[in-house]
UniProtKB/Swiss-Prot annotation:
GO terms for biological process: translation. It comes from Arabidopsis thaliana. This is Small ribosomal subunit protein uS3m. One of its GO terms (molecular function) is RNA binding. The lineage of its organism: Eukaryota, Viridiplantae, Streptophyta, Embryophyta, Tracheophyta. Component of the mitochondrial ribosome small subunit. InterPro entries: KH_sf_prok-type, Ribosomal_S3_C_sf, Ribosomal_uS3_C, Ribosomal_uS3m_plant. Its main location: mitochondrion. It holds the Pfam family Ribosomal_S3_C.
Amino acid sequence: MARKGNPISVRLGKNRSSDSSWFSDYYYGKFVYQDVNLRSYFGSIRPPTRLTFGFRLGRCIILHFPKRTFIHFFLPRRPRRLKRREKTRPGKEKGRWWTTFGKAGPIECLHSSDDTEEERNEVRGRGARKRVESIRLDDRKKQNEIRGWPKKKQRYGYHDRLPSIKKNLSKLLRISGAFKHPKYAGVVNDIAFLIENDDSFKKTKLFKLFFQNKSRSDGPTSYLRTLPAVRPSLNFLVMQYFFNTKNQINFDPVVVLNHFVAPGAAEPSTMGRANAQGRSLQKRIRSRIAFFVESLTSEKKCLAEAKNRLTHFIRLANDLRFAGTTKTTISLFPFFGATFFFLRDGVGVYNNLDAREQLLNQLRVKCWNLVGKDKIMELIEKLKNLGGIEELIKVIDMMIEIILRKRGIPYRYNSYFYEVKKMRSFLSNRTNTKTLIESVKIKSVYQSASLIAQDISFQLKNKRRSFHSIFAKIVKEIPKGVEGIRICFSGRLKDAAEKAQTKCYKHRKTSCNVFNHKIDYAPVEVFTRYGILGVKVWISYSQKKGRRAISETYEI
């Protein structure tokens, strides 16, 4: 009698459990109910329409296990053809992996008080400037009430954004409750004056970075949608990107901000045409950093005194450093916080670009010799005397705690983490299971069976390609550490009149008979004009001593 083997999915570390109810019909039906319930819920939040790209189920993967449910949201950038259109529309911000989740709208639906309340905005097409009436997607009865459809095809976009937010930006800064204290008067007036009178400052990418277009019009939770500039969590909006990456970045201010401000921009070495654009972007970033260094770290208007104060505290940092600190393991906070987060009480804008460049160059050279983590508390005590704003000091103390203890950013200080926690608790109560929601940044699509299966399904839906060409493309992109891959297609592969058949493609070793092998498996169904196609993917990871098995697919 043949030996009954365990299913391949049990071989993964997270599935290895002694729960005997894995094969029972009761729990199988429960998993199916949870999956259907979750998918119907996500599909009803923001369905795709002619005006909106929507929240598509292809952007999330729901994995059910005996004791846990994992929901992974994938936040890709917009297609390139849509990016080129957006270059002529400065009012629209580009889709980035850390902001797309907020635009997709699943969390906003949870906090809405009135499901039938209309939210009207004016969306103008590129060709015909006609008014388009957009409504909240929760009111499904009025989805098709669209007036004045543009002549030209309108691009996909999220129509519930305010295009005229920058007109009232200085007014919002002055009346915001976060800066009503007399200590903030000089800072608010300085920023508002700069916004109103300096058009070149509005066009810079650093302006779009700190003053993003994320505000909502009305509602009881509008305080969560206010500008990042008028929220106390401004520091965490900026630091969120750095703490989500496990590997620390070398602190070159130009490189860091270039990577942060323009994440989708091509490198100058890869595109010859982008050399001039890259240099101009670096110049703008350098000048803007110098402006913040001069205007935000000094209490007086004298540039020479500000330079002396900065040089003095750099020397303090050098005296506190310890042996063993290298350029690749430096901490981001001390000088990043000193250049961006210490506000001042005076008003003054300097126009000496040469002095700015000298100050910036001195800062960049001295940043390589940073203080060690065990001495960072002593340095911060000296840095506190430069600030004078109590709320920022509290935030700085919390940032120190995050760096020293390697914690994540507390959800109560950031609306993103706060809303994710609310959504996690909502889904856990609805499905009676422990639901985990994680926003992930994909390292490589071709090292996870579920992602490869999703990619194949998208290719078969959008355009008819031969299965051999799809498999050949996947084989070329397989990273190191993957020992082998096997893909099987089943169904009516070519024509509706053809009988159903199965084709399997194999690359290297993909043995499913050895229990100790680390194998990932994922099935997916593709709905085509000829019927349903089944796609199954097996990936075998290598476990040699010289290489580590790629079991961690995502970078949290």
